[in-house]
């Protein structure tokens, strides 16, 4: 019976015959058959011959090990060839996530972001202001140290052992200590201050700014849509618009879009522009800079005020006030240490700006309404066009009145500058005169370079000199740090003088080839944002 138990069953024999007939006997059956033929040898304590025992499949004792009875294979195992795994590209046929599943994930994510700690974590992880972006999104400390320690290392594809060797040579970094955090905060403040100095063009030598990135962000201007960090009761990120810039304290005055938030003063390191912001290479700041000006002042000309001011007559408060006669005639009186006439002009300026702000708000709402009608392919009514044109004309008149008042206010600022211990700045007329003299000298040398004049017509020579003077004025404005409306006015006056001297048939050519390009350059040089209306022609002809 023992021998019968050791034989394979009929089903396995039939399978073996079939496989033999087909010429492919499986290895597994051979291993099974050979294992059935082998019987373990029981080694007893006596020195007698070994007794063969039948093979048992039952559970062995935990003290018994059959490793000694197994045959040791001296051959090394066959190594499979490594197959390079090529990442498969995602195709359009792959299943997209279910809409309900996406909504569920979005709902859970929204609930997560409602938590104060999760919201702050997102702010700390992804919110970087314009002044901090080049500092944090550039090379980290390890990359900087790697460049300094191994300048000849051109590759980044190193093995783990090679990277470990480099880390051992560089030493263990000091992290998460109070001294480390204090040092990092101090270094960050210094870099921010250096960027602010570059933005304000108060630096002539950039050799001390080698630790800054190659691209320096330009300061934000008035009217820029931003996302700002608001602290206090309403702690979080909110969208708004810049209404004022304070370069002295490095802050922005932001009016938030959400009702109830109002206007707040936000530091520049917590304000991020919603649109891609422009940067300037740090090498451009090393060019010749013009000294900063404390006051942006017009030419110091004697101004005779008119007997009746159209703005005062049309003003419901100042026009009907019983103190109008006293206030209008008080040229030498002071109030709070300032001339009364100066305070009147400041009041007018504030009122005009407030009215202009309301008109701009209405115009923005009408633009939104017009875009909505256009998206629905609906016609824009005549009444809508009439209201839109009325607002545009009123804005044009406000800009003219604003330019008049600004002229007077800045004239008083220029007169008050010596009393405050400030040095008056050079006048734009002086800059224009110097540019014209230099242009005439350049044209004269170029015209007589060959020994005889190339252009003999004096009118053409004068025209070339004036056009060259415009280029020199643009160069002076580009090299200057602080731009103001009166410097742009000198450029506009030069264009108007040239336009008045040329023939009427050439005015269209002059506008298309000269004036429009100068206007584009002037718009690019100006950093006054929505206040570019201040750079309009002075309509004060008194």
From Swiss-Prot:
| Positions carrying Phosphothreonine | 96, 304
For biological process, the GO terms are: DNA biosynthetic process; DNA-templated transcription
One Pfam match:
LIN9_C
Q: Does this entry carry the keyword Phosphoprotein?
A: yes
- Give residue numbers for the modification (Phosphoserine): 65, 95, 309, 321
Keywords in alphabetical order, please: Acetylation, Cell cycle, Coiled coil, DNA synthesis, Isopeptide bond, Nucleus, Phosphoprotein, Tumor suppressor, Ubl conjugation
- Locate the N-acetylalanine modifications and list their residues: 2
- Gene Ontology cellular component terms for the protein in this record: nucleoplasm; transcription repressor complex
Q: Which InterPro entries match?
A: DIRP, LIN-9/ALY1, LIN9_C
Where does the protein end up? Nucleus, Nucleoplasm
Segments traversing the membrane: none
Q: Which SMART domains match?
A: DIRP
Note the position of the cross-link Glycyl lysine isopeptide (Lys-Gly) (interchain with G-Cter in SUMO2).
Answer: 21
Subunit info?
Component of the DREAM complex (also named LINC complex) at least composed of E2F4, E2F5, LIN9, LIN37, LIN52, LIN54, MYBL1, MYBL2, RBL1, RBL2, RBBP4, TFDP1 and TFDP2. The complex exists in quiescent cells where it represses cell cycle-dependent genes. It dissociates in S phase when LIN9, LIN37, LIN52 and LIN54 form a subcomplex that binds to MYBL2. Interacts with RB1.
Give the family per the record: Belongs to the lin-9 family.
What the protein does?
A: Acts as a tumor suppressor. Inhibits DNA synthesis. Its ability to inhibit oncogenic transformation is mediated through its association with RB1. Plays a role in the expression of genes required for the G1/S transition.
User: PANTHER family recorded for this chain?
Assistant: LIN-9, PROTEIN LIN-9 HOMOLOG
The protein, known as? Protein lin-9 homolog
Q: Provide the species name.
A: Mus musculus (Mouse)
């Amino acid at each position: 019976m023992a021998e019968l138990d050791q034989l394979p069953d009929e089903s396995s024999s039939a399978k073996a015959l079939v496989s033999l007939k087909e010429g492919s006997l499986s290895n597994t059956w051979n291993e099974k058959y050979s294992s059935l033929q082998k019987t373990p040898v029981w080694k007893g304590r006596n020195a007698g011959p070994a007794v063969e025992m039948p093979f048992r499949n039952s559970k062995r004792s935990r003290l018994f090990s059959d490793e000694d009875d197994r045959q040791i294979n001296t051959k090394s195992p066959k190594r499979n060839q490594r197959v390079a795994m090529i990442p498969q590209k995602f195709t359009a046929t792959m299943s997209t996530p279910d809409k309900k599943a996406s909504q569920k994930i979005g709902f859970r994510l929204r609930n997560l972001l409602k938590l104060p700690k999760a919201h702050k974590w997102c702010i700390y992880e992804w919110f970087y202001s314009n002044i901090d972006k080049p500092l944090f999104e550039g090379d980290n400390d390890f990359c900087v140290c790697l460049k300094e320690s191994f300048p000849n290392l051109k590759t980044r594809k190193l093995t783990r052992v090679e990277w470990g060797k480099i880390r051992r040579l560089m030493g263990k970094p000091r992290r998460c200590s109070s001294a480390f955090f204090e040092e990092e905060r101090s270094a960050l403040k210094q870099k921010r201050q250096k960027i602010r100095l570059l933005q304000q063009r108060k630096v002539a030598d950039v050799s001390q700014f080698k630790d800054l990135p190659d691209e320096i962000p330009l300061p934000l201007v008035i009217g820029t849509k931003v996302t700002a960090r608001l602290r206090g009761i309403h702690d979080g990120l909110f969208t708004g618009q810049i209404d004022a810039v304070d370069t002295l304290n490095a802050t922005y005055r932001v009016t938030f879009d959400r009702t109830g938030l109002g206007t707040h003063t936000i530091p520049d390191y917590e304000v991020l522009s919603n649109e891609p912001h422009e940067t300037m290479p740090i090498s451009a700041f090393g060019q010749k800079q013009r000294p900063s000006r404390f006051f942006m002042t017009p030419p110091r000309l004697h101004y005779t005020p008119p007997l009746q001011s159209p703005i005062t007559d049309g003003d419901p408060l100042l026009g009907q006030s019983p103190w109008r006669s006293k206030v209008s005639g008080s040229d030498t009186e002071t109030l709070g240490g300032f001339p009364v006439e100066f305070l009147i002009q400041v009041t007018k300026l504030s009122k005009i700006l407030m009215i202009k702000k309301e008109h701009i708000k209405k115009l923005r709402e009408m633009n939104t309404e017009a875009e909505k009608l256009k998206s629905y392919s609906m016609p824009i009514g005549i009444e809508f066009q009439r209201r839109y044109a009325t607002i545009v004309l009123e804005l044009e008149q406000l800009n003219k009145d604003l330019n008049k008042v600004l002229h007077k206010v800045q004239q008083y600022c220029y007169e008050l500058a010596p009393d405050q211990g400030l040095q008056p700045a050079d006048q734009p007329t002086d800059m224009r005169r110097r540019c014209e003299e230099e242009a005439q000298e350049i044209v004269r040398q170029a015209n007589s370079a060959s020994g005889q004049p190339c252009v003999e017509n004096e009118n053409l020579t004068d025209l070339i000199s004036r056009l060259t003077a415009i280029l020199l004025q643009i160069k002076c404005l580009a090299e200057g740090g602080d731009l103001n409306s009166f410097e742009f006015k000198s450029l506009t006056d030069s264009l108007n003088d040239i336009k008045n001297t040329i023939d009427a048939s050439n005015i269209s050519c002059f506008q298309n080839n000269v004036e429009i390009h100068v206007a584009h350059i002037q718009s690019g040089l100006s950093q006054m944002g929505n206040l570019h209306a201040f750079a309009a022609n002075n309509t004060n002809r008194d």
